[in-house]
């Protein structure tokens, strides 16, 4: 099997996507296709479109929120780092202590994030300026965000989803393989907020998942 003949034996957190290429060439190829920007549709496509220009009412609805400054429809995972770096939301910090946003904004952009959370601690990772992590967050969303690098099983690499389950009295480690296929996406593709002065990433799910539940929360 491939696990008995791996060319790159990976231990622990591995953020470098290219190290998975030799052992998982087909999966790596499909990942590289997220770099494409060749179609637009009613449901976004893969081209960055200025959503505020298309829907100017969102500037008013998002007033006081960073998305009122700039929001483009998302491109593929391979563009995650360059797109957030170019966004007006993050500004142009000239030093690690400047800029309008916390490093929490990096959370879903790179497999380097779990590496830095392990090195610094989750609280310390969030409680920094966005610019402070720029030299470390260099690999775009990829393999180890959703797969355990040692076993390639689906896994949750971001703490906010695990914590949201815990506050509901649920154990995410009991999720079925079928549920994990959704949950690996749910750790990032969700509504969230940055809690308190520490800008701790939090999902407002304590009372449920609907808009009304979140408003009640």
Model-derived regions, located:
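Aromatic/pi-system hotspot detector in well-structured domains
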Residues: 77-79, 83-87, 109, 147, ...
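A cross-kingdom signal targeting lumenal/periplasmic-facing segments of multi-pass membrane
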Residues: 90-116, 121
């Amino acid at each position: 099997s491939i696990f008995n003949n791996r060319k790159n034996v990976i231990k622990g957190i591995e953020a470098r996507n290219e190290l998975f290429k030799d052992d998982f060439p087909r999966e790596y190829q499909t990942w590289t296709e997220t770099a494409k920007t060749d179609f637009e549709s009613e449901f976004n496509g893969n081209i960055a479109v200025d959503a505020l220009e298309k829907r100017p009412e969102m500037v008013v609805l998002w007033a006081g929120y960073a998305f009122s400054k700039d929001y483009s429809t998302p491109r593929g995972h391979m563009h995650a780092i360059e797109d957030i770096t170019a966004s007006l939301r993050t500004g142009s910090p000239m030093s690690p202590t400047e800029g309008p946003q916390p490093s929490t904004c990096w959370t879903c952009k790179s497999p380097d994030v779990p590496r830095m959370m392990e090195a610094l601690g989750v609280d310390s990772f969030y409680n920094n300026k966005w610019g402070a992590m720029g030299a470390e967050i260099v690999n775009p969303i990829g393999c180890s965000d959703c797969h355990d690098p040692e076993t390639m099983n689906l896994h949750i690499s971001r703490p906010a989803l695990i914590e949201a389950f815990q506050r509901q009295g649920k154990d995410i480690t009991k999720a079925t393989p079928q549920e994990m296929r959704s949950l690996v996406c749910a750790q990032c593709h969700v509504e969230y907020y940055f809690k308190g002065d520490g800008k701790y990433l939090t999902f407002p799910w304590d009372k449920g998942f609907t808009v009304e539940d979140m408003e009640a929360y």
